[in-house]
Amino acid sequence: MPDTPVSPSKNNVKTSSTPVSSSTKVIDSLHSKIDELTDELTTLKQSHQELTKKHSIVAKKNDSFVDQLANAKHENDMLSALLKRKERRILDLEDQYNDLNSQIENLSLSNKNMKIRCENLQNNSNASIAEFERLKISYDALIASQMEYKNHYQQELNTLQTSFDKYRTENTKRYEDLQSSISSNDKDIDTLLDSLTNKRKTMDNIYVNKNNKILQLLTSLASLIKLHAEDTKGQVEQNVDVIKILMEKYPDLQEKILEKEKVEVDLDEIISHSNEILANTSFEEDATLINSPDLDSQSNLNSGAATPVQNSGPFRKKKNYKRNSMILKDSPSGIPENSVPSSLPKKPQVNNNIINIPKNRSKFNTPPTTPRQFSNQSTDFEVTHQWNGNNNQHNNSGHYNNNNHRRTTSYDARSDNGGNRRQHSQGSNYNNNNNNNNNNNNGFVRRSGSVRNGSNNNNNNNHGKQAKRRSTYNPNNNSKRNSQIFDSNFALNV
């Protein structure tokens, strides 16, 4: 800044000390300096005012610029957020665009498939229309042929109806003629029926007499068997005594037999075996004949009637039970079979209708080769021979249990109106029921004689195997019949 001008009071003080001329110059110079300073001050004031105005204007502009900058920052932030949203929207739109492209491809492929399917359906529709046309033509042809068949069969039915009416008329006339003939023959039928009934009674009497004779023969046979068994027992006892005497007399008897016969024999075993048989054989009870068996409790023995031979080896150990049949086992090596018997008979024991007959004494072991002829037979009779020994079971009944014995004929004049055969009874009536044994399949001969007594000919046990009866008729004389019961061991004509 310029120097501050000197005030007039100070100038006056200085001038007072100086001459008057110099003071005037100084005053003039001072006045001039004051004027200059005044002008300069005025100029500075004016410049100051101008600068103040400019400062206020610039401050206002600065404030407006600050406001604009804040607005620009806010607008920039808004634009940045909007840009980010736009970018996210663009990404979403790109994803949607990709999805839409894939959907468009799928739809185009589906469209192609639908076009192909539509073409196939169109082809099928055309084929169905053609088939329908063909079936329609066939249906029309079938309808036409059906009408022709209907007319044809209607004519045939009319013809058959006419023939049937004619046939019915003829049969009615024939039936009336037969009815009149039957009415005229009633008297002859009654006479013939009475004659047939009388003949039937005569035949029944003959059968009963025949059965009685057979029972007597079997009784005699049982007695003879008992005597033979006692005789055989005595012979065995004598043979055992002889062997004991020989062993006492010749202690080296076995060595001599081995030396001479080249066979080893155990005499002690033979003696013990014979003594065991003699101890288990008794003839205390008497054999009795029972006319009719108890069949209700015999069904459990049917399976044992056809048991095959078991335990056939020689000199097997025996159980302690009473034997009721005589069996000759294979004798030991070195001794003939007829020299030392291996078993002895015991007294026949009878259980219900069972009579025990030894095997070697039965005359029914071999079936007859040719059946014997008997006429007018009505009673079923069968004999079965069974034996066992050494726990062996020999059944001569084969595969038949002889459960039921019935005559099978195509026609029986002795049947009543109910289909049941009339049976004549003598003494106690013998039912033609099951014939089974209660003697645990021991050796026996089973005998049964049955006479029909008017009961049904069917037996209680219809499920077992049946002995078959074969009936043959003479074509020249129907009243004669050969009836035979077949058994695996023997057959008896009755």
From Swiss-Prot:
What are the Polar residues biased-composition ranges?
1-12, 291-313, 363-381, 417-428, 472-494
| Bias (Low complexity) ranges | 13-25, 385-403, 429-462
Q: Which GO terms describe its biological process?
A: endoplasmic reticulum inheritance; mRNA transport
Establish whether keyword RNA-binding is in the entry. Answer: yes
Give the primary localization class.
endoplasmic reticulum
Question: Topology relative to the membrane, per the entry?
Answer: Peripheral membrane protein
Q: Keywords for this entry?
A: Coiled coil, Endoplasmic reticulum, Membrane, mRNA transport, RNA-binding, Transport
Gene Ontology terms for molecular function: RNA binding
TM region positions? none
Q: Name one GO cellular component term.
A: endoplasmic reticulum membrane
The parts of the chain that form a coiled coil are 24-173
The superkingdom listed in its UniProt entry is: Eukaryota
Is Cell membrane given among the entry's keywords? Answer: no
Q: Region (Disordered): which ranges?
A: 1-25, 291-494
Subcellular location per UniProt equals: Endoplasmic reticulum membrane
Family under the similarity heading: Belongs to the SHE3 family.
Annotated function:
RNA-binding protein that binds specific mRNAs including the ASH1 mRNA, coding for a repressor of the HO endonuclease. Part of the mRNA localization machinery that restricts accumulation of certain proteins to the bud and in the daughter cell. Required for the delivery of cortical endoplasmic reticulum into the emerging bud.
Q: What is this protein called?
A: SWI5-dependent HO expression protein 3
Which species is this UniProt entry from? Answer: Candida tropicalis (strain ATCC MYA-3404 / T1)
Lineage of producing organism: Eukaryota, Fungi, Dikarya, Ascomycota, Saccharomycotina
Its gene name is SHE3
